[in-house]
């Protein structure tokens, strides 16, 4: 894990808290106190809290752009699943605790949520429904409501970019409540 802003890179450091909170079916890891915790909900697995740094990941595109192109990443643990004894295995990564026993219902709810994006516009053309679903990825949740990450993934929310993108992301899809909130 990097736990960083997308404009920076992570390097091995002593500020990272390697401690895991593990209980049956759930792991919580919060490497830095000012960032949200990472919650991993999992089916039965063997957990090894190894806390290892993997050094010197090379990013060719960043190097071409003259940016910091070398990064260290921290692996808080290893989960080992026995696929021979399970029909399927679920792993949920989130910033809020999740219950792995609800993995199927989470998946179903997300499929229904994405499908519902096209209902207000009463649209069935595959290209349009694909674009509508893709447009939703630029709308991000904040503690104070929703925002537009118009230059996702390179930029944060900026007022000018938000106003340029807002009509195509919300208004043409009849997502008036989302537009109003933004």
How would you describe each model-predicted region?
Residues 1-182:
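Acidic, mature catalytic/reactive cores of soluble proteins
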